[in-house]
Regions:
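Short amphipathic alpha-helix that is part of the acyltransferase structural core
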Residues: 1-39, 52
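Conserved acyl-donor/pantetheine-binding loop and adjacent beta-alpha core of acyl/acetyltransferases
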Residues: 26-85, 93, 136-144
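Residue-level recognition of the GNAT/N-acetyltransferase active site
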Residues: 84, 89, 117
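Conserved acetyl-CoA-binding loop-helix of GNAT-fold acetyltransferases
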Residues: 88, 93-107
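Accessory recognition modules or surfaces
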Residues: 95-99, 142-150
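Conserved GNAT acetyl-CoA-binding A-motif
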Residues: 102, 107-119
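Conserved active-site alpha-helix within GNAT-family acetyltransferase domains
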Residues: 117-142
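Acidic, metal-coordinating catalytic segment for phosphate/diphosphate chemistry
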Residues: 158
């Protein structure tokens, strides 16, 4: 089944939709605080994307574009996408919604970085993500994984 990924608006309706995820989800995946901050800052651009079934938001993620000057992961150095807080409501899991969100992120044709949470490593592996060589200074206790578009490889860290 094909799902349409929509760019979510920063408004109080989206805030109400996000409350369903907090009710069922894990605190570390909560986007309520992120959305509240964006509403109060009156931001126009939203990093939030989601999939609706009918009138209900059932899957969502945040996408942040990182500038080339901050790239410590990809060769050649370039701008990349960071996926945060991808979540599908429990009753809609294993129906291809998470895959649809990741495939949407890949359409930007930029490398993608994320840090898997809550027993999701198998999902990310199926989506073509691989672990990077851990660097204690760069990764700060995270275990990032990445997806490489054609022509991109892992940036090799140099010893200081």
């Amino acid at each position: 089944m094909m799902y349409e990924v929509k760019h979510l608006r920063i408004n109080y309706k989206t805030l109400e939709e996000f409350k369903k995820f907090r009710e069922y989800g894990l605190q570390e995946l909560s986007m309520l605080e992120d959305l509240n901050a964006k509403i109060s800052e009156n931001e126009i651009t939203s990093p939030f994307y989601g999939i609706y079934l009918g009138d209900s938001l059932v899957a969502r993620m945040s996408l942040y574009k990182r500038d080339k000057k901050y790239d410590q992961y990809f060769q050649p150095p370039q701008s990349y996408i960071e996926v945060w807080k991808l979540e599908v409501l429990a009753e809609y899991q294993r129906k291809g919604l998470g895959k649809a969100l990741v495939e949407f992120a890949k359409t930007f044709n930029l490398p993608i970085k994320t840090s898997p949470r809550v027993k999701s490593s198998e999902f990310w592996t199926k989506m073509g993500f691989v672990p990077v060589t851990y660097d204690i200074d760069r990764d700060l206790g995270e275990n990032p994984i990445v997806w490489f578009p054609k022509g991109v490889t892992e940036q090799k860290q140099t010893a200081d």
